[in-house]
C-alpha cells in the first residue's frame, strides 16, 4: 500500500477514487507541492531535469540525422537540390496495399517514403555536410552528447555532486557564464565552423578532420588579424555568378558585408552570416564580463536596481526590492525566460522566410510554409506559458512588504487602468475591423464591389520605402538616392540590400495593400485580446474586488462553492485556458495570411490575394475552400495519391478537434451519472465483471475536464491546419 502512486503525495496516494491517478499526473511536475520538498531539493530536481531534457533533444536530433543517412537521399539531393525531393525516412508498412506503395514511392526511392519538409537537408548542406558518412558521424556524436547529458543529470542527483541553494541563487555568475559561455563562446565556435568548414564547402573544398590543419580558410591566414588589416578578410568575395558548392565564380573573402542574397541559392551570403556570428560573439563575450562576481570587477545587479531612481518620482520606489523578488522566485524567472523565448521564436518564424539563411530553402515552398507555421504556433504556446507562470508568481511568491511602492506593486495598484485600456483597444479593433470586412462582404454579395471601403496602408508603405522599397514612389531615406543614409551605405551593403528588397521573387518586404491593412488589424485584435486575457489573469491572480481572497485558493480552482455567487471561471488558470483559444485563433489568422499571400506570390497571381482578401467570403472561398479541395479529394474511386495521408490527417484532425467540445461543453455531473451507469452495467455483465478496480471511478474535476478539452481542441486544430498547409502547398509546387 505504501508504494501506491503518487509517492510524492501521501494524501493523494490514499484517495480511494480514480482522482488519485489524474491528480497524481497533474501534480507530478509541480515539485513545490510535493510532500517532503525543501527549497534545496526543488532547485536540484529542476537542475537535474534540465540534463534529461538535453538528453532527449540530442537523441531526437541524432535520430533525424541517422534516419536521413540510412533511409534518405541526401547525396542525390546534394547533386541537384532544386529538383530532387528530400526524403525524411521510409514508411515501413503503407496501408491500403499496392496503390499506397506506388503513391508514396518518390524522390528516387526504392520503396514508400516520407518527404522532408523540415529544411534539415538545406541546413546540413549549407553548413558543409555532403555525404551520408557525415550524417552518421553527426548522429553518433549527438548520441554521445545525449549519453553524457544523462550521466550528468544522474551525477548531479548524487549527494557529493548536488549544488547548493546559494550556487543556484548566484545570479551574477550565472548571467556571466550564460552570456559569455553559452552565447559568446558558442557563437565564436559557430563562426569558426562557418569559416573553416561551411564556406570552403560552398566553394567546392571538402574540409574534414584529416585535412583540417592543412587547409587555410583564407590565403593570408591569421596575418591580417594580428596586423589590424581586418578589411583584407572582406576582399574578393564570391561573385554574383558563383555556383554554390563549386569553385566556379567563388572568391576568398571570409567575413563580408555584401547585403542581399546569393543569386543562385536565394539565401544570405555565407560570408555575411559568418561576420554576423563573429560580431554576436564579440558582443556577448564582452557582456559576459559585465556583472560582479568574486573577481570584484563589473556591476552588482542589486546595486544597479536599487540605484535607479525614476525621474520625478513618478514610479515610486522604482526597482527597489526587485532583485530578491526575482532571484527567489523560480516562477518569475521562468516567466521572463518564456517571454523572451516566445518573442525570439516568433522572430525566427518571420526571419526564416524573409531573410533565408540556408541555401535553396527559399525555393522549397512547402518547407518555407511549414517552418513559418511551426515556429508561430510554438511561439504562441511559449508566450501563454510566460503569463501563466507570471500569475503563479503572484500567487505563490509575491511578497507585498518586500515590494512596497516599487514598479511591481504599482502595476498591481493601477491594474484597472491597464486592463480597461487593453479592453477598449480590443473592442475598437474588433468592431472596426469586423465592420469593414462585413461591409465589404455585403457589397460583393450585392454585386457592387466598387462600394467596398478599401484603405491603403500608407504608414506601413512609408516604412517599407524608408527601408529602400521603391515601388510606392515615396522617395524617402533609403529609397531616395539623395539621402545621407543612402550615400553612406552605397559602398558596402546597400546595393545588395536594395537589389533584394526590390526583387519580386523573394519574400523581403512584400508589396501591401487594403487586404493586408484589414488582416493586419484582425491580427492586432487577436494579439490584444489574448494579451488582455493573460494580463488580467495575472494581475487579478492575488485578488479582485469580487474575490479579494483569491490567492488563498491557489492557481486553479473551479469556484468557491454556491455560497459566494460568481466565483466560477475567475482563477488565474481559467484566464490561461481562455487565452489559449484566442492565441490559437490569432495564429490561425497569421498563418492564413502568410500562406495565402505566399501561394499567390509563388504562383505569380498576386492579384487573387489583393482582390479576394478584402471581404470574408474571399477568405472562405478563395483561400480555405479552394486550397482544401485536394484534401477533400484524397480518396476517390480512382484510388490513392501521394496526398491521401494528408487527406486522412485532415479528417482525423477535425475529429480530434470536435472531440474537444465534448469535454468543454458538458460538465462534471453528466460524466458522473454516465460513469455510474457504466460501472453498474460492468458489474452485472458476465466475464466483464471478473475485472474489478481498486479505485472507485469518478468523473474528472471541472478544471481537468477543461484541460482535456483544451488539449483536444489545440491538437486537432493544429493537426488539421498542418495537413491543409502541407497538402495544399506540396500539391501545387511539389
Curated annotation (Swiss-Prot):
- Residues recorded as binding chlorophyll a B3, renumbered to this chain, are 662, 670
Q: How does it sit in the membrane?
A: Multi-pass membrane protein
Q: Which GO terms describe its molecular function?
A: 4 iron, 4 sulfur cluster binding; chlorophyll binding; electron transfer activity; magnesium ion binding; oxidoreductase activity
| Annotated Gene Ontology cellular component terms | chloroplast thylakoid membrane; photosystem I
A Pfam family annotated for this chain is: PsaA_PsaB
Q: Name the protein family.
A: Belongs to the PsaA/PsaB family.
HAMAP family the record matches: PSI_PsaB
Subunit structure and binding partners: The PsaA/B heterodimer binds the P700 chlorophyll special pair and subsequent electron acceptors. PSI consists of a core antenna complex that captures photons, and an electron transfer chain that converts photonic excitation into a charge separation. The eukaryotic PSI reaction center is composed of at least 11 subunits.
Protein name, UniProt field: Photosystem I P700 chlorophyll a apoprotein A2
